[in-house]
Each structure stands twice: as structure tokens, then as C-alpha cells.
Amino acid sequence: MTVATEKTPHKSSSMFKLFSNKLRGNNDSTPAAAPAPVPTKKLTKAHTSAHISRSASTNTPHPLRNGVTGIPSASPAPRQMTRRSTGVTPTMVKSSKQLSTLTAHNSNPFRNKNGTISSASHTHNGPTNSQHMVYNPYGINNRPTETQSSVRGSSYSRHGSGSHISSGSASSTNNNTDLSFYMHDGDNKIRMLPLPIADPNEFLPDDIKQVSIHLSDNFSFDKDNKTIGSGGSSEVRIVRSNYRSKDVYALKKLNMIYDETPEKFYKRCSKEFIIAKQLSNNIHITSTFYLVKVPTTIYTTRGWGFIMELGSKDLFQLMEKSGWKNVPLHEKFCLFKQVAQGVKFCHDNGIAHRDLKPENVLLSKDGVCKLTDFGISDWYHKENEDGTIEVKQNAGMIGSPPYAPPEVMYWDAKKKYPTSMQKPYDPLKLDCYSLGIIFITLINNIIPFFESCNMDPKFREYENSYNNFIRYQNKNFRQKGTYKPGPGSEYMLARRFKNADASRVAWRLADPDPETRYTMEDLFNDPWFQSVETCVDVNDVNLVRHPQIKKTSSEGINLVNAADAHPIPSPMVGTDTNGGLHSDSENPAGTHTTEESVETPKPASIRELHKPRSMVDIAESPMKKAATTPLFTLDEEAKEERDHEQETNTTAEADNEKAQTVPTSAVDTNEFASKENATTTDNDNVNTKATTADPTTQQGAEITETGSIAGSISASISASITASMSGSVSGAATAPIPRRDPSNRSIHSNATSTGTAGRKKKVVHHHMEVPGSAFQI
């Protein structure tokens, strides 16, 4: 018995007890580590759907005996385990004497209290055999069943699951009825207009009503689909003409803001368009062409948008470059004066911008500054009952810090200023203060302070410096008509001007006191400001090619008959009422070619267009359009480009010849006069001599014989030269040659000078070529 016992050990009940103690790992002698805290079931907004899909058992870290946190997926050693990872209390192993049958050893320790076993979690979203599919028009319902909720946690339970499901899935418990929840991946801050979208012509005056009101009629999105700018109320994308791929424009897509109603949205957008359209005939204003309907596409949602001139960059992007500090001061002064000329043009036309900042100043490829974004602009004139007109005072927080003056910052609700300090203010002086802060930022390459209020320490320092300069150096600094030097290098915000007169202009514009602040009239009367030379003249023609409009909208066809009754030609059919280029350069003003003109349809066709279209017509419309519309070939595009280049070269040659033949100084005039006196015998009538023996006229005849220009151009050149010489000979010998009429200037010019070739510019800034220039950074 003893040998048999040694070969086959007897497994008594005491041995089973010893084995069970071994499994427990000396729990009697060493205290076990505290169990891991059960994770809370409530999910925060910071969690993503990836966090939610994990089960509670695999996501809970297992506490170890030695207190070291282990990896959730790693299995601890048997001796180190103090509690089963499944959370089920281990069943005590009984002695074999107490087991009635062998099946007692096959009990599953993973079953729950109800005696059922939870199904294993799966990663797919489809329903299992035990689940019922719930219909969802946006896809399969990803909400788990009650069985899965017991395993994954109460965050998937039926009570309150709508607030925890990720925004990417559409749940039946989600009470959000805003369609933008599905159009913008759950971002319900961007709201869409309800259908149908209103016709823009219903909100526009008769003189600027449009024939085409749909974006897709004549424009298409750029293939790169880049958002070149975005804000709280709009986003800007690039669109191209459907007829000339090289004609690129900017689409400013307008969005609804806050709790704005559709009616308020339409009025706000139409007001901005009317103001921008009214100011589009100036070289320092970004041209705005059309107000169109924008359809829902993969790029953007439905709404309204502006077709605008596309700028190269804005002034803020220019100043944030690392090499901006190396740009010469005279170029910075040039850019500042261009911005000031744009602001003055707005004020002269009765409009206050009210949101001037470097981000709202665009630059063309030629280096011309252009104001943009008239979203909060307004007409500042107010007509009283007695017929007098005065400036309309504003109230409320308007503009962007730090470009908003102190009198505006008092209206900021976050600052909690007393109501006694909140007084109405002049919107024109708001623009002047913003212009002064832009000038200081332009020179110092830093924003002087964050907010123009006494709660900002930098502004308090600037205000103290302002008062100290007046108290100790220039007591008459704020007096009107005083042009003494301004602050010098001892003041931080005047140090980099390196010119006391320039710092005077900047500080007078940015005067914290609106009563003594520079106005636009004071600025343009300042001697230093008048001496600043710019590379562009304010009277130069705006060189912007207007888009071609060849396709009309069904809503705008009735306007074709009304267009003939208006004395002002519509700018939508290729005529430029602003003095700029036509959509087709071959068209004279007030005429339309057969390519761009809109034929007046018959009344029967108009009635048919207003009938609802069937689904068959909608499906067949692309095939009908492809069969009737000829494709635009490369030969036609090349021919159009050659014709345009030939016309440009012809006009440029005429301007160059005219510039060479006109005397540019009094010395040339005397030389021409001496030659006339030597070749004529009649000394009584000087005008007759100049007419009969003018060598310039002979030169013009030779040019005509060689065929370089037309005879009419030569005759006009000769007549102008004769008149100039007659006046110079009969008058003083040092009399300057009068400048040409701005209305007769040529609209063709090079990239370095936007003026005409016949008039020499004061200064030419080659922004694209000068080393260290702003455009070479």
C-alpha cells in the first residue's frame, strides 16, 4: 500500500484545500491591493466614438498585487491575481466527497446571476440574429440592444443615449431637427436657408437687377476646391468662368448667423451687395459683380453668394511675413496712402466702413490696395425734418479690437462699463481711428495692444505716452491746423517711423479722444501726407475684367424686356457702367454682341419656363444640352486670346508713339519753336507757323505711311501736339505741359504702373521686382 501510494498520490480533501489556498496567493498573510474603481457610465463630450465602442471589461485596467498598473490586454501571473478580471466572484472548489456527479465540475464561472452568458462583443455595426433592425433613412442604426448595453455600460442604454451617441451617426433618439446636423457632420452652428431660396432681384433696386441669378449658369468651382478664407458669416472659394478658364473670381458664400431669420438674412446680404456694388468703380475698392444663388454641392450648402474680384493676398498676410521689417519705409507709406484713399472714397459716397483692419485690405497682383468686406458698413447720412443732413450717430459694439476706438469699446458687454459711459459715436471717426491703428501696425510690424480700453495695460501705456507728449513737448499737438513734429524715438510706438511728421499723422489718427481726432479732411490737408508718393493714381481706371454672362436664369428672363427701358445699361450683359473693362473687350459701351447678348424670348416660351418640370425632363436635360450646345474648342480660345493681345498691343503702341512725340519739358518746346522760326517767313502769326511747319506733323505723316498706326490716331496726335506747342510758344517759356484728361486715359497698362503710358508717374514702385520688397518675402 505504501509503494502504491508513492506511485499514485492520493488526492484527498486536504490536498484540494491546499491547492485552493495556493491559488488565492497568500491572501491571509499579505493584504490584497485595493480593487480598481469602477468607471463611471456617464460620457463627456470630449470622448469620441472610438472610446464608446470599447467594452467595460477590456477597458478597465487590472490592479496587480504589487500596485503596478498593468496593460489592460496583458494577463497577470496566477500568483499575482487578487480578483478575476471578469468581475465575477470566484466559486469555491469543493471536495470530491461533496460532489454528487461529475457535471458539477463543469460549471461556467463567467455566467452572471441570471444564469445566462453574455454574447461576445463584435466590431461590425450590423444587427445580430437576436436583434431587430430598426429602419433609419440615413443608414443602419448603430444603437446596441439591451443585452449589449448590459455589457458595454449604461452609456448605450435606451435612457439618455441620444446625448452620448457620436455626431457621425443618426439615432432615432436624437431630437435635433436641424438639417444642418446631417449636412455638416453634426455641426449645427452652420444653418441653411429653407427652400425655396429667394430671388435676389426681389431685394435689389431696378438699376442693378440681374439677368442671371444662378451660380451654375456661368461659373463653376475650381478643381482644387480650396477655401481661401472663412469667417463667422461667410466663406470664400475660387470659381472660374464657364467660357474662359483663365478668368478666376472669388465666391463669397454667405451664411446665416446666430438666430437670424431668413428674412433678416436676405436684407443683410442685399444691403452689403448694394453698398459694395455702389463703390466698385474705384481702383481702391474690391469690385463686386453679381449676387447669385448657390446650390447645395459637395463643396458648400445652398444660399446666397457674391461674385467678386480675386485678390492676391491681404495686408495682414503681408505684414506677418518675417521679412516685412526689411521693407523700405517709402513702400509702407505708399500702401498706407492707398488704404486712406479707399477710405476717403467710401466717405465721399456717404458710406462708413466700420470694420477697417488689415484682413479687410486686399492686394492685387500689381500691388494695389483694395478695401473689401462691407458686411457691417452703413450709410451715415441722416436727413432731419427741416431738410438738413447730418452724420447719423451709432450705438453698440461694432468693429474688431484693437481697431475699434475707446468710445466703441464702452459698449462691449463683457467689459461691464457703466451706462453713463456708453454714448453715441461718429462712425466716420471710428474709421479714422482704425486707419491710425493700421498705420501703426504697418510700421511697427506688431499690434500695439489687444483692445483700445483702459483694461488693457498696453493701451494705458499708450494713452499715458500720448498725454505726456502733449504736456511736456507739444502742448498744441491736438489743435486743428498745427503741423509741428510728432513724437520721436523716445516713444515705443513712434520709434520705427524715423520721421516725426509721419508719427504725427499716425498719432493724430489714433487719438483716444474722438473730439480732437484727425478727420479724413484733416489727413488729406496734412503736408506730410500730401508729399507721400504712390505707385498708383487714385483716378486710374480699375483694370478688372468683368465676367462673361451668356446664360440667363428662368427668373431673370422677364428682365430682358425691361433692360431696354432703363437708361443705364445693365452691367450683367457685358456693359461696364463703372468705367472698367467689358466682359468682351471688343464691345463698345452700350452695345452687345450676338455672343453675349440675351435674345428676348417669346411670351409662349416664358410661360413654359414657369411650368413645373417633370422627372423625365430633368433626367433628359443633360442629354439635350449636350446635343444642342457646341463645345468650346481650343482653336476658339486661342483665337480669342490672339485678338485680345493684338488689340492690347495696338493701343499700347499708340500710347507709346504719342508719349514720344509730345514734348516733356520747356526745353523741348523751345527747341521745336526755334526750328519753326528758322523754316518759316511769317513772324506775325505764331499759330500759323506751328500749323504749317510742324516737324511733329511730318513725323506723324511718316508713321502713317509706314502703317504703324491708323490715320485717325495720327491725326489726333498731330492736333494735340499742335495745340500744345501753340500754347507753349505763345505763353511763358517755362509753362508745363498740361496733363491729359483722366477720362481719356488708356485702360491698358503694365504691371508696374497702373497709370497711362502717356503721363509720367511721380514714382514707380516695382513691388514684384524690388529686392526686399513686400512681395518678394
Curated annotation (Swiss-Prot):
Residues 50-61, 83-133, 575-592, 648-672, 744-756 have a biased composition (Polar residues). PROSITE patterns: PROTEIN_KINASE_ATP (PS00107), PROTEIN_KINASE_DOM (PS50011), PROTEIN_KINASE_ST (PS00108). InterPro entries: Kinase-like_dom_sf, Prot_kinase_dom, Protein_kinase_ATP_BS, Ser/Thr_kinase_AS. Residues 222-529 form the Protein kinase domain. It is an enzyme of class 2 (transferase). The keyword Kinase applies. Belongs to the protein kinase superfamily. Ser/Thr protein kinase family. The active site is at D355. The keyword Aminoacyl-tRNA synthetase does not apply. One of its GO terms (molecular function) is ATP binding. Residues 21-174, 564-705, 728-764 are annotated as: Disordered. The gene is PTK2. This is Serine/threonine-protein kinase PTK2. Its EC number is 2.7.11.1. It holds the Pfam family Pkinase. It comes from Candida glabrata (strain ATCC 2001 / BCRC 20586 / JCM 3761 / NBRC 0622 / NRRL Y-65 / CBS 138). Keywords: ATP-binding, Kinase, Nucleotide-binding, Serine/threonine-protein kinase, Transferase. ATP binds at I228, G229, S230, G231, G232, S233, S234, E235, V236, K252. It catalyses: L-seryl-[protein] + ATP = O-phospho-L-seryl-[protein] + ADP + H(+); L-threonyl-[protein] + ATP = O-phospho-L-threonyl-[protein] + ADP + H(+). CDD domains: STKc_HAL4_like.
